[in-house]
Amino acid sequence: MVRLKEDFYVPYSLPGAKTENLNNTIVYFIQETLSPARLAGEILLVHETLDQSVENRKAWIYNPGQRRVRRAPNVAFDNPGTNSDNLRTSDQLDIYNGSPERYDWKLVGKKEILVPYNAYKLHSDKVKYADILKKNHINQDLARYELHRVWVVESTLKQGMSHLYSRRTLYVDEDSWQILAVDCYDRRGQLYRVQEGHVINYYDLPTVWTTLETTFDLSNGRYLALGLDNEEPQTYDFSAKFSTANFQPSALTRRGVRRRVQAVLGVLRLRRQRKFFAGVETLRETQNDRE
């Protein structure tokens, strides 16, 4: 189990936003690894560019061991996704992301299929991770599938281009435009991996957002579950206030230093607690001896 903290800033969705004022950047993204300890402290920063034929995606990684920030040009396309145990590619985060340039795209049409939807049971704080994560697949008693109209979009790898997936079929919700499922085919044309986006409707915002993203590897029976928050004290906070200043490479170093200070303070508190409890235990032993 890997715990992550992710921040998004999407300036193109702000009222009155105009593409010419976005500096060709539509999404700012930070992913910070909180646990386990062997991975904790690594921070990924991405500036997602609008027109990647003009300027490629920009990415940086903060390494807590080296305490330095470096460029990360490989955070794209079919390079392994961070903290995924090689079960997804970089462009599979949020179901699909990044430049479409390696594929030819075709709008096949509209059809009705069963898709993950209204996943409120999977989102419930009454449910534990162990209730959801089962061998080979998630607990289907908690998942919900509904018959919905979706747009079917096919992407086929261009001649001369390289990618782990030779073809993808995306199923895009007619109402929300959220990608709900993807079939990913290997270089031999065989179905290789299947993605699902289990969504809920935040009526108060309003928006539709995934509460769980899954990627199933049919070649080995393993799967990746991303976005679980059932046991966390806080779920998605759509009211967070950000600016581009929060998403600069220099901010990664400050964030890393802050985490190290918090970690040191946590160790000091733990040592004080251990010393206190050791004293209590000694006192009890002494009292027992007297008795």
PLM feature spans:
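Short, solvent-exposed polar/charged micro-motifs at secondary-structure junctions
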Residues: 1-2, 82, 115-117
